[in-house]
Amino acid sequence: MADPDHVASIDAIVRAAYDVISGSSGEKRDWDRERSLFYPGARLIPTAKPGATDGLAPQMLDVEGFIARVEPYFAENGFFEKEIARRTEQFGCIAHVWSTYESRHNADDPEPFMRGINSIQLFYDGNRWWIVTIYWQQESAEHPIAKKYL
């Protein structure tokens, strides 16, 4: 069950989504909290290269698949992700958030090791917000983040 404060608004659920995955190396993440943010059947979709010689492609994950993918990394590496800019559009009970992020290994690192954009689709059921999809791509030399997203 989600904490009502974490799902009461678009701001709250986006903040919770970043907070739950952030922590020091070896710090256990609250995966029940993570699960509580997502609508049943929700997807997390990193854009990545499946193999060294492959091009970018969406990697379709459910919440459990995402946890299985990142948990070993978090056990060995600090990971702190924070939102640095946002564009939100809403119609009725659906919302779309372009959320630009920076990632650091330590919360106080002066520079991020990675930046990118999360495309977050949300649903409001009349009582709370749910994450339906987070689809993201890291910034690269080939795909720098446009000023309108900063």
Where does each model-flagged region fall?
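Non-catalytic cap/lid and distal C-terminal segments of serine-dependent acyl enzymes
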Residues: 39, 65-69, 79, 114-117, ...
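Surface-exposed, charged secondary-structure patches
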Residues: 43-44, 48-109
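Tryptophan-centered short beta-strand motifs
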Residues: 58, 110-112, 129-131
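Short beta-strand edge/turn micro-motifs at domain boundaries
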Residues: 115-145
